[in-house]
Amino acid sequence: MDARQMKIKAAEAALEHVESGMRLGIGTGSTAEEFVRLLAEKVASGFQISGVPTSERTARLCLELGVPLKSLDELPELDLTIDGADEVDGKLRLIKGGGGALLREKIVASASTRMIVIADESKVVDVLGAFKLPIEINPFGQVATRLAIEKTASRLGLAGEIVVRSSGDGVFMTDGGHLILDASFGRIPDADALAVELNAIPGVVEHGLFIDVASMAIIAGPEGARTLTAS
């Protein structure tokens, strides 16, 4: 089973948790896109949901495939969000934001009664941090903000390169018009403390540490999909 097949397996298992009539947050990224494709097939057969996308990219795919969408302002309370993750640990703490949609992903997930994470087994880690931590910042004062992040990380015993994310045509900009810093801290022994400290930096809009947000994770491997709950 290759990587895409595992993503499809996780998405199939997640789809079993979606009930007709649900207000559904729809994530961003390659695994979430497999979920959207499967959801669209079900919608085409008469299944009723109202989706709230976490990015313009997801919105475009949903509209292309016929998945009905609403804005979060129209549906401010959601039943369930299904989204991918770049890393997930045994306490269901996540690193997200590899696709650049972390702010909207966190807003939508926080507006949901439950969040189910879908991923392949390569994303499961003992300690978060092998994946670069995305930190969304305001463009104004970006150098000062990066310096504040470096000092904060140092106080917590973390160090590593922090770079502005680029795209094919220059600096990457989020859907909200912000920059993303990718922080190569390595292992983050106290993700909870880092999340609190990053939240206190004025120029930080959001960060990719999702703490106490996910309700469960569906992890796909060569033998099929399994469910993780917080240990």
UniProtKB/Swiss-Prot annotation:
GO terms for molecular function: ribose-5-phosphate isomerase activity. The active site is at 105 (proton acceptor). Its EC number is 5.3.1.6. This is Ribose-5-phosphate isomerase A. Catalyzes the reversible conversion of ribose-5-phosphate to ribulose 5-phosphate. Substrate binds at residues 28-31, 83-86, 96-99, 123. Signal peptide: none annotated. Belongs to the ribose 5-phosphate isomerase family. The keyword Isomerase applies. GO terms for biological process: pentose-phosphate shunt, non-oxidative branch. InterPro entries: NagB/RpiA_transferase-like, Ribose-5P_isomerase, Ribose5P_isomerase_typA_subgr, Ribose5P_isomerase_type_A. Pathway: Carbohydrate degradation; pentose phosphate pathway; D-ribose 5-phosphate from D-ribulose 5-phosphate (non-oxidative stage): step 1/1. PANTHER family: RIBOSE-5-PHOSPHATE ISOMERASE 3, CHLOROPLASTIC-RELATED. Keywords: Isomerase. It catalyses: aldehydo-D-ribose 5-phosphate = D-ribulose 5-phosphate. Homodimer.
